[in-house]
Amino acid sequence: MRGDMAGIFNDLLDDFEAADLTVVNLECPLIEHKSPILKSGPVLGVSIKCIRALKNAHINVINLANNHILDHSEQGLRNTMRICHEAGIEVVGAGENLADAGKILSMQVKSVRIGIMAIAEHEFSIATRNKPGANPLNMMEFVRQMRHHREKFDYVMVLLHGGTEYYPYPSPELQQVCRFMIEEGANAVICQQSHCPGCYEHYEGGYIVYGQGNLIFDAHSNQEKWNQGYLVSLFIKAEGADKMDIIPYIQSDKRAGVRRMDKDKEEAFKKDLHEMSARIKDIEFVEKQWREFCKNKRYVYFSVLRGHNRFLRGLNRLVHFSDWFYSRSELATLQHVIRCESLREVLNTILSSS
């Protein structure tokens, strides 16, 4: 809160300062007073004084399209946008309404015209036609945006807050979505939700990153990769040619803040990630890994559906008692309601109105 960017970003500051344009995801509102909403999952928020460190770290753009930006209601979001504006930092991915949240941010960097789109999966932060929030993932709207605005930019970057927590590979659907965005004219798609370092790929001339990991997130976690992540460096030319590099780091372990990995750890990290990333070119591998991951999550999600508390969720993982409540016929009905687009829309509308 004192604006001590050196104590927070340590040797990553050199990379921030060397960049012509620095973009970060702010996964919580900047607040003066708490005004938490009713939602599933943790409610996050930090003091408005934290803007000092972001400004002093030479951050140019803050992405607000994520699942926590509305955690402290419309008041928290509006406060965040105001504080960023007063600090001279651009924001993207959220706004006063759906149209405002979906605006492409235009940045001129030397001779290169860069367009930044920021999009979030549907959670408790989404803007509507008349209410503030984050820009939702809507592929039809994405295509419209690209048709109407693509020619205005030399380079289009999409920041997608999507993916499965603690899963380093893309799901089959996420990979399809990101690849389609490249096919429609995006030059880079950067996903930022997994809380662990994710794979990347070069696809039809564009770059896709399936998760960068946490940058500054000092919450305690037993997840192995919680304290690891990487910056994405894009080297862009006006004619559209580009190159991508990654800068691995350690964050919020026994020391506060974030710092680059030492040379040996960085080389090992890059090697492992490169090998993992090579595997996702094989669609069958992506599908097989996803099925295995979901198989291991079966009883977690069945507990969620039945509203179990933490104790019952843990017990269900051990003894699988939720199997007693779901016959094959009941599972088929559940699948039908979730899988069918029209039925899913009905269910979502009912729950949203409750």
Question: Language-model features: where?
Answer:
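N-terminal catalytic scaffold of extracellular/periplasmic and nuclease hydrolases
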Residues: 1-65, 71-73
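A short C-terminal boundary segment appended to hydrolase-like catalytic domains
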Residues: 231-354
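Active-site-proximal segments of metal-dependent phosphoesterases and phosphodiesterases across multiple
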Residues: 33-55, 155-187
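Conserved beta-sheet core of the metallophosphoesterase superfamily
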Residues: 58-61, 172-231
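Divalent metal-coordination and catalytic microenvironments
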Residues: 24, 64, 68, 117, ...
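Binuclear metal-dependent hydrolase catalytic cores centered on His/Asp/Glu-rich metal-binding motifs
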Residues: 1-10, 44, 108-156, 176, ...
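Active-site environment of divalent metal-dependent phosphoester hydrolases
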Residues: 1, 30-33, 67-81, 98-103, ...
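Short acidic, glycine-rich surface-loop motifs adjacent to enzyme active sites
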Residues: 19-31, 66-67, 146-169
